[in-house]
C-alpha cells in the first residue's frame, strides 16, 4: 500500500518539500540558515501576536502599555525580549544566508535570488516599523529621521512624507499605521517565503562546490532534518542566553525614555542591523545622493548575477575572489561600527572610504578578479 504522505493532496506537497526532497550530499552548515530563518519568523509571529494582545497604538498610552507588558503580564518581559532580540537573531541569520549565497554563487538561480531580495526589503521594512512601536525617544526620532529621507525625492518628496506621517510630524496617525503594517507584513513575508521555496525546488539546491550534484543526491529526511534540528537548538540556546542574561545588550538606552518631540537625543541611530546602510547614507553630503546610496547598498544584490564573470560558480576554488569576499565582510563590519559613531573626524573619512570600497569591490574588483582567475586557469 502506498504511504499516505505520497498520496494525500496536502501531505504530498509537504513530503516533496521536506521529506523525500533530493538534496546534494555535500551541504555544509552554511545551508542551515534558510531553515533557521523559518524558525526566527515563526518565533517573531508568535511572540508578536501575544504582544499585540496587550499593546495599544495610541501615543498617550503606548509607552505605558509596553511597560505594562513587561511588569504585569505573565512572562510579558520574556515575550517582549524574545521579540526584540529575535529580530537581531533574524538579521544575523539573514545576513549569513545572503553571504552564503554570494560566496557559493547561489545567485545564479535568478528567480530564487530576486524573491530573496524582495524578502530582505520586506523584513527590513517590518523591523523599521517595529522599532517605532515602543514609542521611546529613539523610536520617535528614528522614525522622524528615516521617513524624512523621502523628502529628498524631487517634486513629490514633501507631500509623500506628510502622506506617510498622516500629518505634519510623526504622531498618533503615524504610530497607528505603522502598527497596522508591522502586523500585516510578516504574513506577506511568509507568503514570499513560500514563493522563494517554490522557485528553489524548481532548480534544486546549490552545493559548496558549485558543480551540479544530480548524480549524488540524498533524501532530505532524515539527513538534513536532523542537521536542521541541531541548528535550531544552537540558535535557540543563543537567543535564550541573550534574552535571559543581557536582554538590553543590542538595544538603545534612549528608548527607555518616553518619546518627546521637544528634546532631540544626542546621537540618533537605528538598530545595529541597519547601521551599515546608515553609515553609507551619512557618508554622502548630499541628501538625495545619500538616499540613493542607501537604497543601492542593498539593491546592488540584484545586479550581482549580471556581474558574475567567472567560469566557476562557487568561490570554493577561487582564492583571489575569496580574499575580496572577506575584505567585503570586513568593510561591512567597519560600516556597522561607523554607523553607530558620531559624525566627526576621523569617523567621517573612515565611513566614506569604507562606502567607496563597498561599491568598488562589488561592481569592479570582483568581476575583474574573476576574469583574471579564468585567465590564470587558462579557461
UniProtKB/Swiss-Prot annotation:
Cellular component aspect of the GO annotation: mitochondrial inner membrane; respiratory chain complex III
Molecular function terms, GO-annotated: metal ion binding; ubiquinol-cytochrome-c reductase activity
Gene3D superfamilies: Cytochrome Bc1 Complex, Chain C
Superkingdom of this protein's organism: Eukaryota
Alphabetic keyword roster: Electron transport, Heme, Iron, Membrane, Metal-binding, Mitochondrion, Mitochondrion inner membrane, Respiratory chain, Transmembrane, Transmembrane helix, Transport, Ubiquinone
Ligand binding (heme b b566): 97, 196
Gene: MT-CYB
Native species: Rhinophylla fischerae (Fischer's little fruit bat)
Name of the featured protein: Cytochrome b
Self-association and partners: The cytochrome bc1 complex contains 11 subunits: 3 respiratory subunits (MT-CYB, CYC1 and UQCRFS1), 2 core proteins (UQCRC1 and UQCRC2) and 6 low-molecular weight proteins (UQCRH/QCR6, UQCRB/QCR7, UQCRQ/QCR8, UQCR10/QCR9, UQCR11/QCR10 and a cleavage product of UQCRFS1). This cytochrome bc1 complex then forms a dimer.
Job description of the protein: Component of the ubiquinol-cytochrome c reductase complex (complex III or cytochrome b-c1 complex) that is part of the mitochondrial respiratory chain. The b-c1 complex mediates electron transfer from ubiquinol to cytochrome c. Contributes to the generation of a proton gradient across the mitochondrial membrane that is then used for ATP synthesis.
Cofactor binding summary note: Binds 2 heme b groups non-covalently.
GO biological process: mitochondrial electron transport, ubiquinol to cytochrome c
Segments crossing the lipid bilayer: 33-53, 77-98, 113-133, 178-198, 226-246, 288-308, 320-340, 347-367
Major site of localization recorded for this protein: mitochondrion
SUPFAM superfamilies from the UniProt entry: a domain/subunit of cytochrome bc1 complex (Ubiquinol-cytochrome c reductase), Transmembrane di-heme cytochromes
Organism lineage string: Eukaryota, Metazoa, Chordata, Craniata, Vertebrata
Essential cofactor(s): heme b
Family to which this protein belongs: Belongs to the cytochrome b family.
Subcellular locations according to the entry: Mitochondrion inner membrane
The keyword Transmembrane helix belongs to this UniProt entry's keyword annotation: yes
Signal peptide location: none
Note: Heme 1 (or BL or b562) is low-potential and absorbs at about 562 nm, and heme 2 (or BH or b566) is high-potential and absorbs at about 566 nm.
Membrane topology according to the record: Multi-pass membrane protein
Record-listed a ubiquinone binding positions: 201
Ligand binding (heme b b562): 83, 182
Amino acid at each position: 500500500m502506498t504511504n499516505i504522505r505520497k498520496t494525500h493532496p496536502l501531505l504530498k506537497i509537504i513530503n516533496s518539500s521536506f521529506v523525500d526532497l533530493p538534496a546534494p550530499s555535500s551541504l555544509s552548515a552554511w545551508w542551515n540558515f534558510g531553515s533557521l530563518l523559518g524558525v526566527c519568523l515563526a518565533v517573531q509571529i508568535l511572540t508578536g501576536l501575544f504582544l499585540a494582545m496587550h499593546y495599544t497604538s495610541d501615543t498617550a498610552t503606548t509607552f505605558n502599555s509596553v511597560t505594562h507588558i513587561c511588569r504585569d503580564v505573565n512572562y510579558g518581559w520574556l515575550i517582549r525580549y524574545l521579540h526584540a532580540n529575535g529580530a537581531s537573531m533574524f538579521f544575523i541569520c539573514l545576513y549569513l544566508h545572503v553571504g552564503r549565497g554570494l560566496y557559493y554563487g547561489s545567485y545564479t538561480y535568478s528567480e530564487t535570488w530576486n524573491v530573496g531580495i524582495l524578502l530582505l526589503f520586506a523584513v527590513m521594512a517590518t523591523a523599521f516599523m517595529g522599532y517605532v512601536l515602543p514609542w521611546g525617544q529613539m523610536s520617535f526620532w528614528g522614525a522622524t529621521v528615516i521617513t524624512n529621507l523621502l523628502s529628498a525625492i524631487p517634486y513629490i518628496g514633501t507631500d509623500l512624507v506628510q502622506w506617510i506621517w498622516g500629518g505634519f510630524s510623526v504622531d498618533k496617525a503615524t504610530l497607528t499605521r505603522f502598527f497596522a503594517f508591522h502586523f500585516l507584513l510578516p504574513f506577506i513575508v511568509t507568503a514570499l517565503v513560500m514563493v522563494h521555496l517554490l522557485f528553489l525546488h524548481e532548480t534544486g539546491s546549490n552545493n559548496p562546490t558549485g558543480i551540479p550534484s544530480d548524480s549524488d543526491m540524498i533524501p532530505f529526511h532524515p539527513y538534513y532534518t536532523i542537521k536542521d534540528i541541531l541548528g535550531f537548538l544552537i540558535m535557540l540556546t543563543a537567543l535564550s542566553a541573550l534574552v535571559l542574561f543581557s536582554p538590553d545588550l543590542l538595544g538603545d538606552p534612549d528608548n527607555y525614555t518616553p518619546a518627546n518631540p521637544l528634546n532631540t537625543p544626542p546621537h540618533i541611530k537605528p538598530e545595529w542591523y541597519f547601521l551599515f546602510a546608515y553609515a553609507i547614507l551619512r557618508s554622502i553630503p548630499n541628501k538625495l545622493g545619500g538616499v540613493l546610496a542607501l537604497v543601492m547598498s542593498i539593491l546592488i544584490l540584484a545586479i550581482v548575477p549580471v556581474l558574475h564573470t567567472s567560469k566557476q560558480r562557487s568561490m570554493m576554488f577561487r582564492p583571489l575572489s575569496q580574499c575580496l569576499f572577506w575584505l567585503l565582510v570586513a568593510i561591512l563590519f567597519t560600516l556597522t561600527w561607523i554607523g553607530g559613531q558620531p559624525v566627526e573626524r576621523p569617523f567621517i573619512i573612515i565611513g566614506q572610504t569604507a562606502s567607496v570600497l563597498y561599491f568598488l569591490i562589488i561592481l569592479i574588483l570582483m568581476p575583474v578578479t574573476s576574469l583574471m582567475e579564468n585567465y590564470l586557469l587558462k579557461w
